[in-house]
Amino acid sequence: MSAYDKVMAARSKDRPTSKDYIKNIFTNFTEFHGDRRFGDDNAVVAGIGLLGNRPVTVIALEKGQDTKERLSRNFGSAHPEGYRKALRQMKLAEKFNRPVVCFIDTSGAYCGIGAEERGQGQAIAENLITMIDLKVPIISILIGEGGSGGALALAVADEVWMLENAIYSVISPEGCASILWKDSARVKEVAECLKLTADDLYSLGVTDMVIKENGGDFIRVYEDLSNKILHSINKYYEFSADKLVKMRFEKYQRLGMITQ
């Protein structure tokens, strides 16, 4: 598949959304609502579930599964209150020593006037600052689209995984073609240049694992993820909180480093 083919696959309406992953990986999931500052944002699903016998804080960007739900969830484009809801759950996870698992599927944070007035940039920045210093394990998984800061706001983690047909980029191919080359017809060429596929980002060291989709057999994907998440969480609990934070900080320090 070309890079643009993967862009279209990541956006497919038939692709499982975050709710499917939560339902098939965790049991007894209880959702929490609101940011205690403005309101609730349906684009972000956050709560606690069990992975085996271990309580886990789960935070997910949810696009919705039909037209009505997609509208209610703003197509997965979160407002500031969504990111602040996520932040609230991260802090609770740290307080109660629960690991955090994030599922990311968004074209980007919502960029409307109301979102800007309520501090969209600040909300994303606060998440980045908090996640780099959070004293519990964090696993972030890109399951579809990973668009710009809206995705990054849940992707500062000990490990970042991508499904093989997911994408992760600072800008969409359409946006890049229009802004840089003033030619939307070059979108396929731009998709290759952006290096936004799972294989590209793994080879660059931006992500830590590519999750195979088994030809669309997502039941196997859920089982595979369940095992991998539990294994990784248990691995990181072998380290002290200070060591965990130090390793995470060093991981992001290495991004973009050039070695001779």
From Swiss-Prot:
It catalyses: N(6)-carboxybiotinyl-L-lysyl-[protein] + acetyl-CoA = N(6)-biotinyl-L-lysyl-[protein] + malonyl-CoA. Residues 1-235 form the CoA carboxyltransferase C-terminal domain. It is found in: Cytoplasm. Pathway: Lipid metabolism; malonyl-CoA biosynthesis; malonyl-CoA from acetyl-CoA: step 1/1. Component of the acetyl coenzyme A carboxylase (ACC) complex. First, biotin carboxylase catalyzes the carboxylation of biotin on its carrier protein (BCCP) and then the CO(2) group is transferred by the carboxyltransferase to acetyl-CoA to form malonyl-CoA. Acetyl-CoA carboxylase is a heterohexamer composed of biotin carboxyl carrier protein (AccB), biotin carboxylase (AccC) and two subunits each of ACCase subunit alpha (AccA) and ACCase subunit beta (AccD). This is Acetyl-coenzyme A carboxylase carboxyl transferase subunit alpha. It comes from Ruminiclostridium cellulolyticum (strain ATCC 35319 / DSM 5812 / JCM 6584 / H10). The gene is accA.
